[in-house]
Amino acid sequence: MPKLSNNAIKIRKTTIEDAAREHFIKQGFHATSMRDIAKTAEVSLGNLYNYYATKEAIFESIIDSYLTVMDDKLREIFAQIDEPLEPSNLRKLGEMLGELVNQHSDFWLLMYIDVLEFQNRHFRNMFDGLTDRFQRVFADKFEEARLRGDLRTGVEPASVFTAAYMQFFNYFLVEKLFGGNQHLNLTDEQALNSITKIFAYGILSEAKLAEFKKSAING
């Protein structure tokens, strides 16, 4: 039997992972058998084991690929945030996170499967140390905001930015995956504006808020 090329192996593994993902999302990890995956991928059960020793190895490979994509997407998003604490940038963050949720719904469904069936073993690093990560990314911007007197007394900018990030994520996850159907009784546009205002008014000093209000009126 001729040896498969690396490209042929990659194609075959992609087919297997696509089949597995379909089953995992539809019926969960533990309810899916290797036989189910082999049948949908149109490979023999024995051949399937040539590519993956276990079902969890398939699950982990799917998640690793998604995490790489998500990491790249989030880096692109953060690169577009000039001033992380200003209203226009917070709203832009919300818009881009909404697009991310809508474009990659399979990823979030697999995350919930991981929470239910593996106690979030495979996705834990996505949230572990999140505030510290944002502090590293935006350290200079946060410090500049402090020095300008833009922040309310006692506000920790990295913590607030993390809270805003998670709130935008949660809003779109509820709408996309849980049938929220305007669960805040607002359209997406109105929800983005409302969440932005909640955090902006909680973060910014009175002087900075007055500056933004003045620019909004003049604009």
Where are these regions (language model features)?
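Short, basic, alpha-helical segments at the C-terminal edge of helix-turn-helix-like DNA-binding modules
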Residues: 64-70
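Hydrophobic alpha-helical connector segments
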Residues: 75-106, 157-164, 209, 216-219
